[in-house]
Amino acid sequence: MQILTRLIVSFLTISLSFSALANFKELQHFGQNPGDLGASYFATQAQSKALVVLLHGCAQHGEQLAQQSGLLGLAKEHGFALLIPQQRLMNNIKRCFNWYSDDDYTKDKGESSSIKNMITTLQKQLGTESVYIIGLSGGGAMASNMLVNYPYLFEAGAVVAGIPFPCADDLITGISCMKNGPSQTIEELVSLTRNLNPKQKNWPQLSVWTGTKDNIVAPLNSSIHAQYWAQLSHIKTKANVDKQEGYVITRWQNAAKEVQVELVEVIELGHGIMVNPNIKNGGEESDYLLASPLSTAQHVINFWGL
């Protein structure tokens, strides 16, 4: 009887997963694809005003992450579109985005260029007015890259268990950055970013997430990332620290008293994206999807005003 029950549960889980993935359509003909990435998307029948880009972590399937994190359910609930760039095994044996490779992180080259072309193509196809980006781990590092290379494309972003860009220029410095934080100072990161975008005045809103026990990507990366982005955004006021049971949120406000940058530190959790299965579209526990008082997807969508 127990074996039969487990088989039924497994069957239902697989069926639900395939059902969720069936919501996505392949994105074809999005222009040049120098990074040789795949892409799929979800959109409601009605025209979507917003497009959210999700960049998965290593060894993950982007569509499954969208479903398990609660982001797909939120897209259906709030009526925004989802774009899922997908790494291919032939590009990286662990299916990580190559965020540390000069061939892929440089503006208008490799994977960075491919993702930009996906965004602009789908944005035109769907008629979306605004674009947002969220990434987990290696996808978080790539999201950092996209926000720096193409800040004009995005209203806002979220980097979860990731690192700031530019932090690494090869695999060795990439590993060092993951374990020890950036070798650059906050001021140097700001200067490098401004030099890449000399005409950019306004920067995307940013939400940065880490678990305080993350032993894969040092939490120091998130702290530095938030401080660097606040300085990049010309924020002069002191940050506000909000301590809650199980997490701490530090917020930096711009001159209009709007939160421009936030750092969410979840106490005693490791490497992953936070989910709260107890709330609607709060996500479900799995590998690198960690039960928490907060749902990252739910919180970020609210933070962005979607």
Features from the language model and the residues they span:
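A conserved short beta-strand
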Residues: 153-164
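Active-site glycine-rich loops that stabilize anionic/oxyanionic intermediates
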Residues: 57-61, 269
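Short beta-strand/loop motif that positions the catalytic acidic residue
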Residues: 208-210, 214
